[in-house]
């Protein structure tokens, strides 16, 4: 009898342990697959592609790669003597047409005062037409001068905002064309996190919800707030042929891959360039309030850590 009782006890204990293990595994699976989190997240920032509005030889480069610069700080300078001469030529044209316009204005005024008693109407009209032509030429010369002045100002390339110079690929002596990107500027205090959440987890993602961001390779947890959720993503399964007809890719009905939707997360505190734009992180959406880690059970703490590996 004792032997039977002992066997039943062992069987019951084993069964209970198996059931508990199954429950733990099931809860872990649900927590892992359905709670709003993703390892596919990246730090991002506002980046300005700086390109000159004038062409010419680069005479000075005043910064080095990855340097922190202030707004309006000079980055590099393009061939100023050429544009200074162009401005001087334009100013000379303006001065010439100003003198010529004054002469033609006096001539037209004199003929208009004398009237048809001293000369023909044709001569009077001709003087007025010449004056109008010279005034138009003066206006054109003034516009050319203003453009030359603007070009001269734009030979000095300045930082549009505080930030870090990155991917600097210009050097003194090189010729740069108008509109060609010379350097990128990563704006200071513009960093945010772009999390690519699976569509099956969007139910737990809303603007204003709190988020935890763990950079890859770091134990530090940053705090943030969901700023916005993308309103749409590209449908890669549908395209159009040459005649505009829809082309739909074949899918296996029993295999459905969840689409990923960009979610923008605003950081509570800017971290400088400690985690550069493009680096990866794990994001967990905790809901309307921050998660109190001190109140988490061992199971939840373990689950949070396992997210870093899967």
From Swiss-Prot:
One of its GO terms (cellular component) is plasma membrane. Keywords: Cell inner membrane, Cell membrane, Membrane, Transmembrane, Transmembrane helix, Transport. SUPFAM superfamilies: HlyD-like secretion proteins (SSF111369). Its main location: membrane. It is a single-pass membrane protein. It holds the Pfam family HlyD_D23. InterPro entries: CusB-like_dom_1 (IPR043602), CusB_D23 (IPR032317), MFP_Efflux_Pump (IPR050393), PHBA_efflux_pump_AaeA (IPR022871), RND_pump_MFP (IPR006143). One of its GO terms (biological process) is transmembrane transport. The chain crosses the membrane at residues 12-32. It is found in: Cell inner membrane. One of its GO terms (molecular function) is transmembrane transporter activity. Belongs to the membrane fusion protein (MFP) (TC 8.A.1) family. NCBIfam families: PRK10559.1, RND_mfp. Forms an efflux pump with AaeB. This is p-hydroxybenzoic acid efflux pump subunit AaeA. It comes from Salmonella typhimurium (strain LT2 / SGSC1412 / ATCC 700720). The gene is aaeA.
